[in-house]
């Protein structure tokens, strides 16, 4: 089994997120242990307030439940609370970490933090899927 890890807010699960999960699952193809196991880490409300300056439209439990209900996802969990957002990587021990095309929070030191943990993890930046149509910031405008 190839563990693929993704992170995000996922504030209203939409087709862009589903495409993101499908792209992440494809990253396991061609790997020695190629049965994909997709782990989704859902950002905590407190983390989102710190990084985006606002609460998400849906609270962390609602967002987690929506991800858990997705047939594409093997495991869903809330992100860590506290000062070490990278802790979950050591807990999960992924083979691949996939980042969204527009994902910037906690990514600038990701390679460095993985090396500090003594891990060998591939990091892949995935392609957008109709970002002018499927982006939570557009879909959640009310």
Regions found by a protein language model. Give the residues of each.
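Nucleotidyltransferase catalytic core that binds NTPs
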Residues: 1-142
């Amino acid at each position: 089994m190839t563990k693929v890890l993704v992170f995000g807010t996922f504030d209203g699960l939409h087709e862009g997120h589903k495409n993101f999960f499908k792209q992440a699952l494809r990253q396991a193809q061609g790997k020695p242990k190629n049965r994909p196991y997709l782990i989704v880490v859902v950002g905590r409300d407190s983390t989102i307030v710190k990084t985006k300056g606002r609460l998400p439209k849906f609270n962390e439990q609602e967002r987690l439940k929506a991800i858990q209900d997705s047939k594409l996802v093997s495991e869903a969990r809330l992100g860590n609370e506290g000062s070490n957002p990278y802790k979950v990587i050591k807990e999960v021990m992924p083979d691949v970490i996939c980042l969204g095309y527009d994902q910037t929070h906690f990514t600038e030191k990701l390679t460095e933090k993985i090396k500090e943990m003594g891990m060998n993890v591939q990091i892949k930046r995935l392609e957008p899927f109709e970002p002018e149509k499927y982006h939570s910031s557009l879909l959640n405008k009310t």
